[in-house]
């Protein structure tokens, strides 16, 4: 039997040999052909993969340069930030970080992330605040593991900027952003409100939260880090005297987070909303960069869709989107858009 010379014939022969059911004596030359063919095929794939990677890298760098120029040329920058930006900064609600601070709760109740645990119907307010005081402290009063927000500030600190965010972790202010140029639409881990609510005020919770975590056995280090005891087991409840109640009606206090119609939009919330509206009004028709960072589709009506609409209504505006996935825009905006998929921390 002659050895086929044409490449397609070689493929057919080798595939046939690889599917043989009954053992046969194989000509060593066939094995050599198989080896040569597989090597050539792998080499082709590697070359193609490298070419695609190089093309992707060049396009990515071109977009990053385009974004840099858009920031430099902008009369104003409107930052719209979602949960993905804090994830990039290291504020993750699963995995090692969850196990470190909530391993006892996970072992008792079976939930696997902080977010799910926040909805658990604990039997007592003492245990509820045992969980939530840890949740608040590590996500609001501890610094983010990575300097993503600080790096972002360096990009825009010389610009006329405003921040619109659905995040509730206070990372922008901790990084040094001007608090008068921010609008936290969905609340703040650092604020409590009446659970009814009987009135529209919010209350700073830092001192009480620190007492709650310390009562469970934690120590607050000089740098603000929460340290677990070396030998003693952590408590999962707080003393009853630390459970906060409304100073006006006596109802239990709760988080100032937008979950339903009971969310309190206090005086500070309305003032921030007015400042944001005024900023947008003052920059109509100007070179505005709408910079969307880590925004998904849970609440697209707050940042994503308005940014699209305002860009479409202003031919001088630029819409930029950085997201780990789904960095995209409507076809109508492609000539005004810069969409980059990736982790903001690595750009």
Identify the residue ranges that each predicted region occupies:
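Conserved catalytic alpha/beta core of Sir2/sirtuin-type deacylases, generalized to analogous enzyme cores
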Residues: 2-347
């Amino acid at each position: 039997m002659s050895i086929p010379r044409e490449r397609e014939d070689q493929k057919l022969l080798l595939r046939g040999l690889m599917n043989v059911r009954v053992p046969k004596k194989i000509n060593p030359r066939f094995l050599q052909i198989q080896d040569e063919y597989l090597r050539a095929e792998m080499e082709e794939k590697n070359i193609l993969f490298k070419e695609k990677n190089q093309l992707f890298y060049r396009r990515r760098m071109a977009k990053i340069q385009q974004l840099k120029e858009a920031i430099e040329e902008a009369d104003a920058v409107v930052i719209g930030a979602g949960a993905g930006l804090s994830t990039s900064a290291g504020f993750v609600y699963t995995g090692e970080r969850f196990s470190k601070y909530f391993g006892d709760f996970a072992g008792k109740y079976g939930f696997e992330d902080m977010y799910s645990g926040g909805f658990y119907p604990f039997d007592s307010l003492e245990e509820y605040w045992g969980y939530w005081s840890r949740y608040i402290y590590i996500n609001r009063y501890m610094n983010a593991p990575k300097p993503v927000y600080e790096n972002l500030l360096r990009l825009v600190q010389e610009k006329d900027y405003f921040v619109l965010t659905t995040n509730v972790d206070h990372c922008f202010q901790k990084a040094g952003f001007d608090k008068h140029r921010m609008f936290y639409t969905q609340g703040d881990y650092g604020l409590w409100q009446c659970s009814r609510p009987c009135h529209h005020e919010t209350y700073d919770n830092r001192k009480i939260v620190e007492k709650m975590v310390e009562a469970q056995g934690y120590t607050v280090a000089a740098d603000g880090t929460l340290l677990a005891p070396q030998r003693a087991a952590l408590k999962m409840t707080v003393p009853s005297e630390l459970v906060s109640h409304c100073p006006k009606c006596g109802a239990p206090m709760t988080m100032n987070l937008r979950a339903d119609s009971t969310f309190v939009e206090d005086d500070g919330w309305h003032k921030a909303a007015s400042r944001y509206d005024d900023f947008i009004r003052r920059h109509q028709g100007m070179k505005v960069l709408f910079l969307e960072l880590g925004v998904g589709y849970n609440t697209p009506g707050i940042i994503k869709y308005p940014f699209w609409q305002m860009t479409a209504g202003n031919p001088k505006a630029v819409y930029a989107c950085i997201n780990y996935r789904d960095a995209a825009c409507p076809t109508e905006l492609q000539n005004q858009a810069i969409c980059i998929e990736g982790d903001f921390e690595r750009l």
